[in-house]
Amino acid sequence: MDVEGGGAAARRKGGWWWWREEAVLAYQSLGVVYGEVAAAPLYVYRSAFAGGDIEHSAGNEEIYGALSLVFWTLTLVPLAKYVLLVLRADDAGEGGTFALYSLICRRVRAGLLPPCAAAAAGEELDAAGAAAAPVSAVRAALERHRVLQRLLLLLALLGTCMVIGDGVLTPAVSVFSAVSGLELSMDKDQHKYILLPITCVILVCLFALQHYGTHRVGFLFAPIVCLWLLCISIIGVYNIIHWNPHVYQALSPYYMYKFLRKTQTGGWMSLGGILLCVTGSEAMYADLGHFTQNSIKMAFTLLVYPALVLAYMGQAAYISRHHNFEDGSHIGFYVSVPEKIRWPVLGIAILASVVGSQAIITGTFSIIKQCSSLNCFPRVKIVHTSSTVHGQIYIPEINWILMILCLSVTIGFRDTKHLTNAQGLAVITVMLVTTCLMSLVILLCWNKSIVYALSFLLFFGAIEVIYFAASLVKFHEGAWVPVTLSFIFMMVMCVWHYGTKKKYEFDVQNKVSISWLLNIGPSLGIVRVRGIGLIHTELMSGIPAIFSHFVTNLPAFHQVLVFLCIKSVSVPHVQPEERFLVGRIGPKKYRIYRVIVRYGYRDVQKDDVEFEKDLVSSIAEFIRCADSNQNSFMDGASHSCEGLSFISKGLPLEEEEGEFDGSDSTGSSAHKEINPNTTAPKPKRVRFALPKDTKIDREVRGELQELMEAREAGMSFITGRSHMKAKSGSGLIKQIVINFGYEFLRRNSRGPAFAVNLPHVSTVEVGMICLV
């Protein structure tokens, strides 16, 4: 669904149609963005009181102070920080930690991705705007000092790792808290043995059903969250009217002061539970690409925020009139629910917790995909669960890892106290990272004064540092979990990024010069067989070493050679007309081309049967529109994109489809994987034919005809299977990272053939040893 398509843009902003579409998007965002924050009333007060740091007294200072803290935290963090400020810092409509990092890196040239990625992006893809950032001390320091660039990358990766940790903890906390309502209807001995198995069964079902995709039941998410918000707000209004109509007085900041003055250290430590009221706030920014700023703002300010405030006020009103709780762990959501409607509310709560968990799981898949696109995570299998809904992906390896970790923490802790301590640290760390990166965006991208940026950093940073310190104190009571998880994922990301960088440097240093190709003649000194050979390379210029290694050991190759370079660039999306760059290597008679295919870090590289067709048609269009100098060729030694041409639209080719008889094993490698449970279509054989255009030059038509014949003969994918080893004399840490860490990840990750979704029968791997 194109939420920002031409139809919406064509209508006048502020008109009836515009408001109608924004309202529809706001309603849809409830099920995707706000499931997690909507489920927070299930466990916020319980987490604040369950630790034993504060006790509910007859004077109600504790519950009033907790309500005041919840209200002002909700007002300042999600409403003031995210809705009013952070949502404006979009990267071509996309949000999230990597969006902020990408904005900063493109503006000040401080990225640590290989140089070719920046060059491949091109100025025309820079969504940050054409205005140059003014020279400042901060910008100069970032561009000059490599250490600051590494710290910036580590900061972005830290936020990403904590989001992944949140993906482990949120399902456990939400589902366990929702199911805990059963304890009010059972004996103490019964619910002790019932809650954990039921929670684990729900979690297993949740993760086991991920490969089916959410598009079949996604239409239910928004109604469920909407029903849940209406339910908790109505219950809140009832409790306010029935138990304590004057509870609104606790919204005054004065009650925060009374709370902290009375409880002192205990009250400060209880802030780790209070901060859970803003869990899920980061999703407003991370999911910006699926909706619009106005729709997300509308949903939060008009429905989510009022409903949550009423829910927390209602719980506080009930608790303020009841002081006979056995301990703090019994102060929770369900005690304030009237007994007659407790079972229906329990059912809605479980559904709402599942929706909130689904949102964070899907978000984790998207983040892993972004990291993999930017060479910060090993290549993983990405399955597109929907052929129509953008961004609906499923990563099997990550899904099962999340399930195992989620079940482990649930069974290991067995209560919400330790789980919420762990979740709180993950949530507040992500917010701190966003605050730090956002202050740099204000200074470097928005060109505001340093006073404005520091004001934002100090105000919101001070609030979040207080909560961060309160959460970190609970390190031995569960907060060690997100730290451990983020450390493991951080090590994986850093090792993979470092190894990939060293591999690229090796390729650059060992590439073959263009003169070597020219000296061996058009036949390349080998037998040229029918078909197209795609040679995968990370280089944008020169001849990769795997090609010379291949022809030295196997002196035969295809009649048409294509050096294919697939790049994920530091912009969220690349338009289809800007995706292909095509050039020629050597004279025309060599029939060697270079194609660079560019994807944004948010682009979904679908398992599309059209990829090969688009590739061939782009080369054909390049041949047709070649320069008048027929013997010109791209300078392979150049470090720029000189010689490459944008192919906005490939040459239209006529197709004839027929049954594939299976006699040609190197035939069309068209392959599409949408869902492993769908029946694969019967393979087809596609015959390409040139359009009947009499204006095409005879020599050009001959080259095009040869390209079509080669495509019909089949297409093979040749890639290097490099074995990385540290050079003798390298440091101990480098040897461990390269010889063991990176090699282990490489052996257990997907090969580059998965980037273009070619079947194994069309792939040839060339082994090489790379000494770095």
From Swiss-Prot:
Subcellular location: Membrane
Residue ranges annotated as Extracellular topological domain: 45-66, 172-192, 238-265, 320-344, 414-423, 471-477
Location, primary (coarse class): membrane
Signal peptide start-end: none
Membrane topology: Multi-pass membrane protein
Keyword vocabulary terms for this entry: Ion transport, Membrane, Potassium, Potassium transport, Transmembrane, Transmembrane helix, Transport
Pfam families: K_trans, K_trans_C
Any one GO BP annotation for this protein: potassium ion transport
Domain of life where this protein originates: Eukaryota
Presence of the UniProt keyword Membrane in the record: yes
GO cellular component, one term: membrane
Chain segments carrying region Disordered: 656-684
TM stretches of this protein: 24-44, 67-87, 151-171, 193-213, 217-237, 266-286, 299-319, 345-365, 393-413, 424-444, 450-470, 478-498
Gene Ontology molecular function, alphabetical: potassium ion transmembrane transporter activity
Sequence ranges on the Cytoplasmic membrane side: 1-23, 88-150, 214-216, 287-298, 366-392, 445-449, 499-772
Record family assignment: Belongs to the HAK/KUP transporter (TC 2.A.72.3) family.
Functional note: High-affinity potassium transporter.
PANTHER family xref list: OSMOTIC STRESS POTASSIUM TRANSPORTER, POTASSIUM TRANSPORTER 24
Protein's name in the database: Potassium transporter 24
Organism of origin: Oryza sativa subsp. japonica (Rice)
